Amino acid sequence: MELNIHNAEILLSAANKSHYPQDELPEIALAGRSNVGKSSFINTMLNRKNLARTSGKPGKTQLLNFFNIDDKMRFVDVPGYGYARVSKKEREKWGCMIEEYLTTRENLRAVVSLVDLRHDPSADDVQMYEFLKYYEIPVIIVATKADKIPRGKWNKHESAIKKKLNFDPSDDFILFSSVSKAGMDEAWDAILEKL
């Protein structure tokens, strides 16, 4: 698929099914805990400074944000999970919204699950990966913030993450940095393959 990534815009924000775009365009969802670098990932992948607003305040994305890319596909930014300063009720509401999208959306082709390369995956990260495997949703693991770790230690951190996730070697695992753009081409290759 030929894709002009510069032709990208935020299309809409949705709280439930009735607000989703009503067409056949394939979608790639982006999931990860708060402040893992989802907005930076979107901006880097689409070569934009602030198409997706980055925030110092975790838990800012509370809706599903749909980004139209060249009228050929969409990124869907899912609310960040695991942020403690949101009420339990609010978290449950997000959980239902995310689950409804991931399990019922026919346009969904794969989920990019973002984890922080510097740390072991959280219980939420593990749960998300298990959820995606259970529902047989194709998953691409993207380990962000690779620039914060010396290159010589990347393998060690990658192994620790894979072990904690009980990683399936048939899934893609990509080391990524929005600062150096490392992993950007690999991420696009993996995404386009799923479409």
Swiss-Prot record:
One of its GO terms (cellular component) is cytosol. Residues 24-195 form the EngB-type G domain. InterPro entries: G_ENGB_dom, GTP-bd, GTP-bd_ribosome_bio_YsxC, P-loop_NTPase. The keyword Nucleotide-binding applies. The keyword Lyase does not apply. Its cofactor is Mg(2+). Mg(2+) binds at S39, T61. One of its GO terms (molecular function) is metal ion binding. Keywords: Cell cycle, Cell division, GTP-binding, Magnesium, Metal-binding, Nucleotide-binding, Septation. GO terms for biological process: division septum assembly. GTP binds at residues 32-39, 59-63, 77-80, 144-147, 176-178. Belongs to the TRAFAC class TrmE-Era-EngA-EngB-Septin-like GTPase superfamily. EngB GTPase family. Necessary for normal cell division and for the maintenance of normal septation. This is Probable GTP-binding protein EngB. It comes from Streptococcus pneumoniae (strain P1031).
